[in-house]
Amino acid sequence: MRIIFAGTPDFAVASLRAAAQRHEVVAVYTQPDRPAGRGRGLTPSPVKIEAIARGIAVFQPQTLRSPEALATLRSLNADLMVVVAYGLILPNAVLAVPTHGCWNVHASLLPRWRGAAPIQRAIEAGDTETGVCLMQMEAGLDIGPVLLSQRIEIGEQETGGQLHDRLAALGAQVLSDGLGLLRAGIRPVAQPQPAEGVTYAHKLDKAQARLDWAQPAQELARRVRAFNPWPVAEAILAGERVRLHGAVALELAHQQPPGSLLAASKQGIDIACGQGALRVRVLQREGGKAITAADYLNARRDLLALR
């Protein structure tokens, strides 16, 4: 089959590899190069890097709504377009171009967590399971019927980064299964999404990473896990702004104001929350690297005297 692949971040790379394994990827669409790093130089997306390594033509339009972009898509004579975390809305005219339309690999069990950040929102909400859906795209945000799906459990201490990697691999497998069926002349049965259970995974931003100690420790611990490795939770700890890379909730009764230091040891730094306490295990000072609580306490001997 002739496939157009549209994707941008690391999450999409495994799916591109799966599509290229037994099919002809005639073009890759990805977001324009963006400034990144300390030098703010233009940096290609992970999908672009993979496409170039495979010798696949790369297109980086600012929009797919122009007549020129539509003409280019039509000229590729694609059987199918596969979309994985592309970052651009596909208008109806684009959805109708490939013979079999457009498929999307989405990192949630739809209709739960439609939108931009399903992996992190699932952890933040305390979900115990998630998965991947292969969806036939329709106009609208992740509303199309589901062709195939796979579910997995979320680990009790699993971070956003760890779950991201597992779902990227699972998404590639589900896509490969779907492409295999289509190649054999079997079109997967499209199941409409239920009207009940719809939730939206709104885009992450750095402001959401600021923790409020007045919230329950369980909620804060989930946010620390969800926002690792980006945008990384941050909070004021003993008068200092730090980033939190690892923490667990303690069901600990106390009478201290939120944000108070309850205990400090090599096992972690316990901070009073609105309900329970948060044990900080891995943290990062401004301008520094992530370190264990034990290493942090070596630099903050004053905290040992306060415990």
UniProtKB/Swiss-Prot annotation:
Positions that bind (6S)-5,6,7,8-tetrahydrofolate: S108, L109, L110, P111
Function summary: Attaches a formyl group to the free amino group of methionyl-tRNA(fMet). The formyl group appears to play a dual role in the initiator identity of N-formylmethionyl-tRNA by promoting its recognition by IF2 and preventing the misappropriation of this tRNA by the elongation apparatus.
Gene field: fmt
Q: What is this protein called?
A: Methionyl-tRNA formyltransferase
Which keywords has UniProt assigned to this entry? Protein biosynthesis, Transferase
**UniProt cross-references to PROSITE patterns, sorted A to Z:** GART (PS00373)
* PANTHER family per record: METHIONYL-TRNA FORMYLTRANSFERASE, METHIONYL-TRNA FORMYLTRANSFERASE, MITOCHONDRIAL
Q: Which GO terms describe its molecular function?
A: methionyl-tRNA formyltransferase activity
Homology family: Belongs to the Fmt family.
Q: Which cysteines are joined by disulfide bonds?
A: none
Taxonomically, the superkingdom here is Bacteria
Catalysed reaction equations from the record? L-methionyl-tRNA(fMet) + (6R)-10-formyltetrahydrofolate = N-formyl-L-methionyl-tRNA(fMet) + (6S)-5,6,7,8-tetrahydrofolate + H(+)
Q: What Gene Ontology terms describe where this protein resides (cellular component)?
A: cytosol
Q: Its Enzyme Commission number?
A: 2.1.2.9
Q: Which InterPro entries match?
A: Fmt (IPR005794), Formyl_trans_C (IPR005793), Formyl_trans_C_sf (IPR037022), Formyl_transf_N (IPR002376), Formyl_transf_N_sf (IPR036477), Formyl_transferase-like_C_sf (IPR011034), GART_AS (IPR001555), Met-tRNA-FMT_C (IPR044135)
